[in-house]
Amino acid sequence: MCIRDSDYPYSKVLPNALVTVKPVDDGSYFLQLDDSTTLLPVNMTSSPFGQKEVRALVNFDETNESSGIYSKAVNINWIDSILTKPIAPDLGVTSNDSIYGSDPVEIVNDWVTIAEDGYLTLRFRTIWGDRNKAHFVNLLTGKDPENPYEVEFRHNAYGDVYGAYADGLVAFKLDSLPDTNGKTVKLKLKWKSFDGDKSVEFNYCSRKSTPAKASIAAERSALNLK
């Protein structure tokens, strides 16, 4: 029997949230949706990511079950972790270039490119030839002594610079930056694009969210990253 397109639950295919998966000491976990909203998964009682705190795309439905101390109870339809990394150590100009690379990317302005909950999550676009070859992506602190909230995105393609454009997702934990102590500051992101050096600013507050875009990403990161 053939399934008609109209029968296919497209609402279950796309992510409807970007969350932080937060393990709890008793082996359970919850999802941090935004600055004030927490989600309790009731159909998946242990995190598929073990005791790791990670950023993830998720598709969920709210339920009427008890959420206890959390804001809402949800059923998870699917959840897919995003590569989640700390800020990388500064190795000096020469070593930074040789190890972290300086290959160009474009930062995509959509709902998953956001500073929230102590993370900078980025959707980026670059050229990919060999999908089996991992590209190395990192976030470094900036060189401006007057601005401790300046960071730089680095990309090492390891010579894989011919092919088609494709998108990747990565999240960086910002806990090594100075605590904003409840204040909202400007987080400046710098990167090398295909058109030269670029930068953008995000509203950033330690462990506090900033508004997301309303659109939905059509696909998850399908690229090999490390």
Residue ranges of predicted features:
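First exposed extracellular module after export/assembly in secreted or surface-exposed proteins
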Residues: 12-226
